Amino acid sequence: PAKNFIPIPESIDYKNEPVETAVICDAIATPLKVMKKARISHADKVGVIGAGGGLGIHMIKMLNLNNVTSVAIETKSNKKQTCLSEGASLYLSPEKNDFHESIMDFTKNSGLDVVIDFVSSKQTLELSANMLGNGGRLLTLGGSGDKFEVDSSQILLKELEVMGSKYCTKQEVLDSLNLDRFRKLLVQ
């Protein structure tokens, strides 16, 4: 229906840059929604699981643009340089033996404030919950359908929040298209 059409601002040359326009409508608008939904602030330390994928890289860039400290968590070692050059303060592979120690060292034993899990498998969701500090927020965007276990006393004592997020709203796409500063986020 016509109500689903979104006006593209004149400042965006969608005829000559159709790929960039499409990226703004997904890989920029989705991280914008995540920032709002997870209530991410400048003081937060944020882990991004699946940081080397399209949404993950743009999430790192969005966090960096907003002066938020991020930890790129990725199993593919060939993504390390991209994650770091796009603004991640630290790059870690969850397959390393000292992974949990590295998170605790980086956060001075407080744990992460937010973990954004673009993979959302049983393994990554359980890992996410264990990385969070007091008042931590876990936001999952993957749709694996896997069940995962978290110690309920950990949720209680740390006052953790677990939330899901799917694709952004029409308004968030409009917001992304209308903010010229997001053009800087496009991965070259």
PLM segments and residue spans:
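Hydrophobic/small residue at the entry helix of a nucleotide-binding pocket
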Residues: T30, G54-L55, Q123
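Rossmann-fold NAD(P)-dependent oxidoreductase module
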Residues: H58-M62
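NAD(P)H dinucleotide-binding glycine-rich loop of Rossmann-like/cofactor-binding domains
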Residues: P1-G50
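A generic alpha-to-beta junction signature in SAM-dependent methyltransferases
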Residues: R39-I40, T107, V119, M131-G133
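Glycine-rich phosphate-binding loop and adjacent beta-alpha segment
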Residues: N66-V68, K122-L186
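Adenosine-nucleotide cofactor-binding segment
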Residues: Y14, K45-A51, N64-L127
